[in-house]
């Protein structure tokens, strides 16, 4: 999978500004990014799940208008965004990873993410939800039971 690495949030914002994707306009702030996207123990794995939303505004500055794809994945591990992984790069994956959006329509998602978001690694191009394999059988069974309601998604432990 192609990816682009950024040294900091400013470089990410410049990339998103220079490469206008889709038609949804975003204002971006690291704090707000952190609050709406999934966090992993490797940093922050950001997935846009706004397919059903016409416009989502995230404040970056008053005038920095940024267009990004609806279905994009951005892995952010940066001290400007989170204390996890200080000094690590920001990675934008291309092409967009499809399928992860289904999770955000799931009933009981909040409880699921409260317990398991730290072990979600990401989503691959085949709609496989990638989960850290270092889990007990009880947790794996709980994850499988939750995800099996969503036929579009399979779970792979890696």
Regions found by a protein language model. Give the residues of each.
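Short linear loop/turn motifs
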Residues: 74-79, 126-127, 158
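Short secondary-structure junctions
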Residues: 23, 119, 152-154
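Acidic, low-complexity, intrinsically disordered interaction modules
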Residues: 46, 67, 71-72, 97-100, ...
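C-terminal alpha-helical interaction appendages
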Residues: 4-67, 71-101
